[in-house]
Each structure stands twice: as C-alpha cells, then as structure tokens.
Amino acid sequence: MKIRVLSLILAIVLSLGMVSMFASCGETNYAENNTTIKLGASGPLTGGAAMYGIAVKNSAQLAVDEINANGGFNGIMLELVMLDDKHDANNIATNYASLYEGGMQVSLGTVTTKPGLEFKGYANADNVFFLTPSATGDLIAEFGNGYQMCFADSDQGTASAVVFNNDYAGKKVGIFFKADDDYSVGIKDNFVKALDASFGTPVMASFTDATADSFTQQVSELKDCDVIFMPIYYDPAALFMKQGNGIVKADAIYYGCDGLDGIDAVENFDINSITQGVSYLSHFNSNTTEGAAKTYIDAYKAKYGNDAPLNQFGAAAYDCVYAIYEAMKSSGADIKANISASDLCDILKGEFDTDFVFRGITGAPEADGKSTITWTDKDGNATNGHVNKTPVSYTVKEVTNA
C-alpha cells in the first residue's frame, strides 16, 4: 500500500514538473487576447542618452499612426509600447517581462547596445522577432531572431576606415574612445584593422565612466592630430571639443559614427564656437531637402515640433516599423491580432532572411528618393541579421577660422 501511495505521489510530482517545464518554454501566448498587433521597445527616455530614445519613440509612433490612418495591417491596428531603460542593462529584465507578458508580438529591441546585449537573450528564449534601429553591437543579432536597421559596429568601423583611406591619406590620425563601452571598443577595433598601413599607428587616448568628467589629458595626447576618430556618444564628444578648443589643431577634423548624431544640439555646447570640422558616418541626413527623408522630417516636425530630438536613431526606428509592416504584407500569411510572438517571428524571419527588399529613408537615397535595404548580401545569402545598405558621410560643421 505504501509503495502504491509513493508511486502515486511521484507520478503527481513528475506530472506537475512537466507542466511547469512546458509553461516555462514559451508555450503561453500572452497575446491571445490582443485586439492590436503590439510592437514593444526599450530605450533611454530619461538620462544622458534620452535624445536617442525619445527620437526613436517619436518616430516609431509616427510610423504606427501613419499605418493605422491607412487602415492598419489588413484592418488590424498597430500599437507601440516603449519603456524607459535609462541606457542601463540592469533595467532590461523587468522591461522585457513587462512587454512580453503584456502581449508584445514583435519588437524594436533596444535603442543602445549594452541593454541590447541583455535583451537579445530573453527575446531568443521566447522566439520574439526584433529589429533594432540603433543597437549596433555585432552580437546584438547573434541569434536567428535578431536584426539591425543600423550598421553593426564592425561595419561602422570598417566603413569609417574606408573614408579615412580615401579622404585623409597622409594625415596624422588619433582615436578617442571609451574603454569600458562595447559600442566604442568594437568600432575602434574594426576601424584600426581596416585602416591603411600607410597611416602608421594611430595615437590612442581613452576614458571610462570613472574618468569622464575631464579630458585635459586626452586633449593633450591628441592635440597634434589632423583627424581624430571618435567612436563615442555626443555628450563626451562635446566635452572633448570644448576642452580642446584652442589646443587641438585649429584645422583638425573630428570624425565619428552614429553616436555623434545630435552633437550640434548638445546643451551648453555651441558647435560653432570651435574651429575644427565635425563629420560622422551616417545612414541619414537630418538636413536633407528632398526625397522620402524630407517627407518624414516634415511629418515629424509637424507632429512633435521643431525642438523635438531629430536624428538617425529616430529615422531608423521609422524604417523599422515600416519594414516590419511591409514584411508582414509580403509574407502573405494569415496574421491575426492574437498571433503569438513566436509564430510571427517565424513568419518575419522567413522574409528577412530571403528576398525581402525594403525601400526606406535611411541609407543613401536613389533616384526615387528612397534607399534599398536588405538583410542579405549581393548573392542573396542571409547576413545573420546585419543590414545591407549604402552609408553616407555627413558633415555637421566645416573647419572655420583656422
């Protein structure tokens, strides 16, 4: 009798364990009661990187509103939910759980890289498709469900080196980077690898969170360089430029990547007060006067005003929403409002990894004012989530009074 009772108890325990195991494997469809298709995102809406997060939220919402005004997806409205992570990876676990359990079916991932490296693991475990506008780390798209609208760090570093090889031959090159930031180090490493040997060894100067209050030492180390590569964000870049004014060569060029977008709008920094030139590798020109990008800019300013942050992060988010929407249409699948995140992920992967071509506002525009964007190479092979489009070099400020 005791043996039979023990066997029964063991069977119940094993049964409950199996139920628990299956429940934790993504079987729950938190979207089963959805009446809209929910897009989730996490980004800095407050703090030092808020200029990026706000632009992403505004632009994604603009795209959602435009799509909904035209009938949504087969009559189903889209809904955007974006949470503040303050550019802190420690906030991602809570944000992701809130988004996923709140019915998120597809995602824009995160705005910045460090939080994105945390986000990708959760999204992979639940098979949630995400297309990030601006988390550039190479490993963001490590798993098969992650994609980037922005150029990955390796691509930014390599493309920037091509600009230097073509435009700055014979110049003395310096590099100012953040040694405790994956974004900065990743771009720097790939830039150095692709830089022509004729430049010799670049002059290196770095900083960390603990040393970000003053760059007098770094300015001194780089003051004789002709071109200073800055794979960093705009706040520390602006501080370096302010402290380097009158010390760094007057006709030097500061050259960055997407993190420098917004450098001309940093509080308490007048970019025209320095003599040096400022340029960065980009996939969007916020001052363009024509094409689809201009249409987006006009709509953005009409909705949010002239003082709202406007940058390539936001433009990429606008493209992200439309790319997801167009891919859903292109799939021909019977997508309902309560489709599970996993099922929608499989549908979208089938598009992005094959012959799906998106015409967007980021990347070098073609004759019709739009750019060609894919996630495959020239031979049609999947690029493991990395975007394929033509970058542009954008000049914020020319050298003056040198």
Please give the residue ranges for each predicted region.
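Cys/His-rich metal-coordination motifs, chiefly Zn-binding "fingers/knuckles"
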Residues: M1
